[in-house]
């Protein structure tokens, strides 16, 4: 099974991607995580990518396409996967279809801009296990202690400022809305209400994918 999660940054794709991937026993591939890993390396490619991220701009198609193709052609992904954050535009979708022959399902996370900004501004994660929290909506049960692993070290994304987020949303809409129209005619396009809480969204996705 190949499932694509579409939606603006902070819509909940990563959280749901990890959960659903575990349920159906396939890898979760998050393009944002891949590029954040690259940025931590001391390479010219990392510096180039980091410049786009800091300015709230989308990374050029040719860079994104090559990175994601290298991942997906690995034997690790031959039995399917959940793809989070790719493709983002028509050019990327057409590139994806040029080397992927399996049927796919596309799930779009529809969410209000105001809620999206709060979700992104408040987002942080445990450095040890990666559990995601939010200073507005989801704090650890014990202050500064991860619910999952007990670590007290957390990671706050420095690129998540309100100005950058608003620019990212604007760029996303310009780039991705034509892609949504394209996929709507595929017969395999579904919309979930990203403004619902985490558990409700998970249930909606499970119904779409016909899993328990």
Swiss-Prot record:
Biological or metabolic pathway of the protein: Purine metabolism; AMP biosynthesis via salvage pathway; AMP from ADP: step 1/1
Region (NMP): 30-59
Residues annotated for ATP binding in this entry: 10-15, 123, 132-133, 196
Enzyme kind, highest EC tier: transferase
Record: residues binding Zn(2+): 126, 129, 146, 149
Binding site for AMP: 36, 57-59, 85-88, 92, 157, 168
Keywords: ATP-binding, Cytoplasm, Kinase, Metal-binding, Nucleotide biosynthesis, Nucleotide-binding, Transferase, Zinc
GO CC entries: cytoplasm
Record-level GO BP terms: AMP salvage
Single Gene Ontology MF annotation: adenylate kinase activity
Known EC number: 2.7.4.3
Catalyzed reaction equations: AMP + ATP = 2 ADP
SUPFAM superfamilies referenced in this protein's UniProt entry, alphabetically: P-loop containing nucleoside triphosphate hydrolases
Annotated localization: Cytoplasm
Gene3D superfamilies the record matches: P-loop containing nucleotide triphosphate hydrolases (3.40.50.300)
Location of region: LID: 122-160
Pfam families in the record: ADK, ADK_lid
NCBIfam families, per database record: adk, PRK00279.2-1
Quaternary structure and partners: Monomer.
Sequence similarity: Belongs to the adenylate kinase family.
Entry function: Catalyzes the reversible transfer of the terminal phosphate group between ATP and AMP. Plays an important role in cellular energy homeostasis and in adenine nucleotide metabolism.
Record's comment describing the protein's domains: Consists of three domains, a large central CORE domain and two small peripheral domains, NMPbind and LID, which undergo movements during catalysis. The LID domain closes over the site of phosphoryl transfer upon ATP binding. Assembling and dissambling the active center during each catalytic cycle provides an effective means to prevent ATP hydrolysis. Some bacteria have evolved a zinc-coordinating structure that stabilizes the LID domain.
Protein name, as recorded: Adenylate kinase
Protein source organism: Rickettsia canadensis (strain McKiel)
Lineage: Bacteria, Pseudomonadati, Pseudomonadota, Alphaproteobacteria, Rickettsiales
The gene coding this protein: adk
């Amino acid at each position: 099974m190949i499932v694509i999660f579409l939606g603006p940054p902070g819509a909940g794709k990563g959280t749901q991607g990890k959960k659903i991937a575990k349920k159906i026993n396939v890898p979760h591939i998050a393009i944002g995580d891949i590029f954040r890993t690259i940025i931590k390396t001391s390479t010219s490619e990392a510096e180039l990518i980091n410049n786009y991220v800091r300015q709230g701009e989308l990374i050029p198609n040719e860079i994104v396409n090559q990175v994601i193709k290298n991942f997906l052609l690995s034997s690790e992904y031959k039995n399917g996967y959940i793809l989070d954050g790719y493709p983002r535009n028509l050019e990327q979708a057409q590139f994806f279809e040029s080397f992927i022959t399996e049927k796919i399902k596309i799930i779009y996370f529809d969410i209000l801009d105001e809620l999206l900004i709060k979700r992104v501004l408040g987002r942080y994660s445990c450095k040890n296990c990666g559990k995601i929290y939010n200073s507005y909506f989801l704090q650890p049960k014990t202050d500064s202690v991860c619910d999952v692993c007990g670590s007290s070290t957390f990671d706050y994304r420095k690129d998540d400022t309100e100005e950058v987020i608003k620019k990212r949303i604007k760029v996303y809409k310009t780039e991705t809305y034509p892609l949504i129209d394209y996929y709507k005619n595929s017969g395999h396009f579904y919309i979930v209400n990203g403004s619902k809480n985490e558990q409700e969204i998970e249930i909606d996705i499970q119904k779409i994918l016909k899993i328990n």
